[in-house]
């Protein structure tokens, strides 16, 4: 039973997550298998949906979906998505390349990302997906250090969300506020067509989305003009920086998924396996 704390209106349940955590990705899958939902809403812009879902179909091969800022339309450092090739290293995306100063927004298609796990599960169960974040010509991130996600093994998601709630502060700048209002408006629109909606969003944003949803004066800000999204292969040397978990741990999660084995405690057990594997080499 989902706690009232995580309900936004009569038809929306929110699952606040810490991005890049295998433990939160596991919690997303558990919740979606336990409760029937007729719609999944995620905090990503609609322009990312097609490329992201195509990339998810190719997991466990990781990739990245990129949207260049409008300020950098003249940049030529990326190839188009139709040149995506596993053997073509010339078109690999290397975020550690210091020779380029490109402004981009990107989504790492990483199975240990809670949002990716939610979309992947919804695709497998044929649940409609809606990307409800506002389109931005240059995304302004909002982040901070959060408590260790391993706490989920000792407490419920509801208790975790309640424990961090007093320390969650609103973002700065007009864009963050506009994004919150836009997502709240989209949830209102979805509530007309769906009765059991699951919203997967950052633990930093959900209290403000809930407040905006219940604001009678809520208005929907207009999206900004954008560039088309593109999808790229990732160079092996940068997986450590792209993936939320260590590449070795991510591989263990994918192997457990394929073998239908228990992966609840892989965040800790995987480190043990990593040390054993390193000792044997």
Predicted regions and their residues:
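Compositional signal for N-terminal targeting/processing segments
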Residues: 1-281
